[in-house]
Amino acid sequence: AASSDRDISSLAEIMAGGAARPPDQVGKISSTFKRASPGIGYGLTETNALGAVNAGAFYVANPRSTGRVVPAVTDFRITGEDGKTMPAGERGEVCIKSPANVVGYWNKPEATAEAFVDGWFHTGDVGYMDDDGFVYIVDRIKEIIIRGGENISCIEVEAAIYSHPDVVEAAVFGLPDERLGEIVGAAIVLREGAQMTAEALREYLAEHLASFTLPAHVWFRSEALPRIASGKIFKRQLKADYAAELAGAR
């Protein structure tokens, strides 16, 4: 957009939400646009989109964080499996209390009782908060890959993949494995004209990630990754398609 002939002088902010933005994209936005600053928000339908916000210089300095809690109207806490609040830096489930929270799910009393406890909405997201109050979303609880007992965040692996200059789109997901339970799979779209092998990708990622988190299976696609109506990548479809492909190859 910055290199086009369109007049974007009135553009003041470039906000994102619904999914993590590749960290290096934040710096590119800041350096490319003279006036517009990047930002990201975290919230859910159940909280009427209220949660945390990261914008401007704070976001550029801390691009992996979804920001600080929206003041006055929102309380945040990170809880462990025992329901107790986790200390700074420790991962757990993100819970939000706010007068903007919905009261429950229509005609779904069991789901309501599970998600809304003592005024706190249990988001189903894994995250943590640092000593300065910045919130970090690690992944959905349901999307954490458990490989041989080790927890792997899809979002963290995706961030490492996106740091490669030839990567345009990436999605990471768990695939069934008889020995380890789950293994890491990745679907990737490269920039036009770029070429890469799975082994070359793993060598690059090994400089940024623990060895057990590296993708065991990598698919390079010529077409864009499928997306749902909200614009999020349709991981469930990718996971089903590639799991079926692997099962058929056995």
Question: Residue spans of the language-model regions?
Answer:
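AMP-binding/adenylate-forming catalytic core of the ANL superfamily
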Residues: D24, K28, E93, S98, ...
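Adenylate-forming AMP-binding core of the ANL superfamily, especially NRPS adenylation
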Residues: A20, N54, V60-N107, A115, ...
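General small-molecule cofactor/ligand-binding pocket signal
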Residues: G39, V218-R221
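Gly/Ser/Thr-rich phosphate-binding loop
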Residues: A1-A61, P71-D75
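Hydrophobic/anchoring residues in structured secondary elements
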Residues: E13-A16, V172, W219-F220
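Active-site glycine-centered loops adjacent to acidic/histidine catalytic or metal-binding residues
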Residues: G18, G43, G67, D125, ...
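Acidic/polar alpha-helix N-cap and adjacent early helical turns
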Residues: A240-R250
